[in-house]
């Protein structure tokens, strides 16, 4: 992957939070949830809009809008436009639940920019791995072996390796320092449902997040070129044991995000570009994904579906993405994904430079799609070419009609 001439942070945001008090929530009759499903027992946050703090399904269908998918069993879910920030529909969006490894999105968004360059190496010590929880998902890091930062991030995103998380945390300054930085960053993103106890999402008492917060983490992380690359990579080679006098071995690792790699009973999702899945005993299955179709980019998060169907979290996420692409422009948003606290709302419309950059992005994305672009047969989020988007000084968020997420390479359809 060519080195970027300049790290570009996209800083154009969604519309301002709605301050209007809306009418009662509309749960589509064809999308009723099981009455026996667990429900939030207390009040929920209203960050992003009052309706997002209401219990149950929130959706307001307009003329021609499709009904929500049937048999959605997630305790909490949300589907939103990644660019405008509009929440198209949600269900218990601010319910504070165990996040499992989807919390690694916050870890990466916090730590990744600080551990540069990614060619930097680290010799793993026993102390680096001492805090890895029993039964953790692992990529296979060995003590007294050397790894690059790039290797470690592949281990985090593809194999959800808690061992890789702990080594990176050690490089960052230690687990307590990392946890404190993650909590601070969550608050900066206005992800106020989140309480961080461990950097890897391992089950700990009081470690919680929400579908809304996880979506904020994904949206923020996707502004970083390395984050986009790692979260969308399907397979990679990971360093193995270094034997004296021999070339170091490697082994292949595969992304556990089944909407990228597919599996029995679940196909790769057309247009998928990440982000992260997770599972623990207390969290159940959790998933946040981003996908593009016909120039529109959607984010979806599903937490702890009760369905016993294999890969239910992916199937429900895919059905919500399908619905979102069909419903876009035909529903009244029920809330917004908020900008970071440090962002200063700007005024007016997009600058000429920003508009020109957007057109260039769209043209390039169209060329990639037409050519069936891929990287080792997988879909991968593109780097921003230096100067393609305008870097706005001072962290200014422009309140515009669009929030230009960098273009995403479309998956080449599998035969």
Where in the sequence are the language-model features?
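Active-site-adjacent loops and short helices of periplasmic peptidoglycan-processing enzymes
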Residues: 2-23, 27-212, 216-221, 225
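Domain-terminus/edge residues, biased toward the C-terminal soluble/receptor-binding domains
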Residues: 192, 203-213, 218-415
